[in-house]
């Protein structure tokens, strides 16, 4: 399954409009923010059509899973589905299991998961974490996090922002690149996104820029923000581009009309059955685009 899909779901009182473009989308937020209402509208329309009193317009096949039924669990309900956007209601504990993560990876479906807790088994993007925002009768599904998020606001004067330390999750070509870019700062690799907090804590002084791949960072976002907020004696900025490979592909270093077309329409080229996250897609695309040229690149070095 690939591509971007849109939904318009409404009742007499509320209207939801949103699009889904990756294999994993997370909807979070407090109670009474519209999450259950959205899934209820989608479910009842799927079950009864216009007789439900609701209206749903979409260019996708979809399914809504609310809870286990007697004699039928989530595997019975979901395993046969193909090329479908599957919405899963909150409080279904199976979404935190390795078995479900394997199903997401292999099924070829898109998943919209309602949960307040991070899904640590799944590699989802910071750009696919949403909250439902209500403005009168119109309800929008808005992105919770953005590509660059400033952790602290206690350094309002830009010339005071002297970054002494750069920490990146990459230990290979990305690390080499950032070391050249930030040659006047201390450059450190955490050897993976799971070690970033530890590395930041070990660097006890100095303002810091932390660079990680946003395409698969979604489950870590909340815990990292909380960990960095308590470091109140210094400024910590967290930058999460899709991936290092993505930055190269978008830089116009590689002159290719085909590449430009792909980068302008990424959802149309990422087959979720083949690529667990966009990060995997960008890595393969960069290797493919540079395989025969002078800009030959590997995962371990430039």
Where are each of the predicted segments found?
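Post-Walker A helix-loop "phosphate-sensing" segment adjacent to the P-loop in P-loop NTPases
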Residues: 44-55
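Hydrophobic anchor at the beta1->P-loop junction of P-loop NTPases
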Residues: 27
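Conserved glycine(s) of the Walker
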Residues: 33-35
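N-terminal pre-Walker A segment at the start of P-loop NTPase domains
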Residues: 1-16, 140-144
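Structural recognition of the conserved hydrophobic beta-strand(s) that form the central parallel beta-sheet
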Residues: 87-89, 108-118
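Acidic, divalent-metal-binding catalytic cores of TOPRIM
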Residues: 92-93, 127-302
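Conserved P-loop NTPase "ATPase switch" module shared by AAA+ and STAND
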Residues: 65-98
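Post-Walker A alpha-helix
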Residues: 38-40
């Amino acid at each position: 399954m690939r591509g971007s899909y849109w939904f318009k779901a409404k009742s007499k009182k509320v209207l939801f409009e949103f699009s889904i473009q990756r294999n994993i989308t997370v909807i979070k937020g407090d109670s009474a923010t519209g999450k259950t209402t959205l899934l209820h509208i989608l479910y009842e329309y799927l079950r009864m059509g216009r007789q439900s009193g609701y209206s749903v317009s979409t260019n996708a096949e979809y399914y809504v899973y609310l809870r286990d039924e007697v004699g039928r669990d989530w595997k019975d309900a979901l395993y046969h589905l193909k090329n479908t956007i599957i919405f899963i209601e909150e409080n279904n504990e199976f979404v935190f299991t390795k078995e479900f993560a394997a199903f997401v990876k292999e099924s070829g479906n898109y998943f919209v998961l309602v949960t307040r807790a991070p899904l640590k088994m799944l590699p989802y993007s910071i750009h696919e974490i949403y909250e439902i925002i209500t403005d009168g009768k119109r309800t929008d599904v808005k992105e919770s996090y953005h590509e660059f998020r400033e952790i602290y606001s206690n350094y309002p004067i830009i010339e005071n922002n002297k970054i002494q330390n750069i920490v990146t999750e990459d230990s290979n070509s990305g690390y080499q690149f950032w070391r050249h870019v930030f040659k006047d700062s201390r450059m450190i690799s955490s050897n993976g996104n799971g070690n970033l907090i530890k590395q930041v804590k070990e660097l006890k002084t100095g303002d810091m820029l932390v660079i990680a791949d946003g395409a698969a960072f979604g489950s870590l976002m909340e815990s990292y923000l909380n960990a960095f907020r308590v470091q109140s004696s210094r400024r910590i900025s967290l930058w999460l581009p899709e991936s290092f490979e993505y930055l190269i592909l978008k830089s116009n270093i590689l002159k290719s009309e085909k590449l430009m077309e792909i980068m302008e329409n990424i959802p149309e080229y990422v087959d979720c059955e083949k690529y667990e996250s966009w990060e995997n897609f960008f890595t393969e695309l960069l290797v493919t685009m540079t395989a025969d040229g002078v800009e030959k690149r590997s995962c371990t070095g430039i």
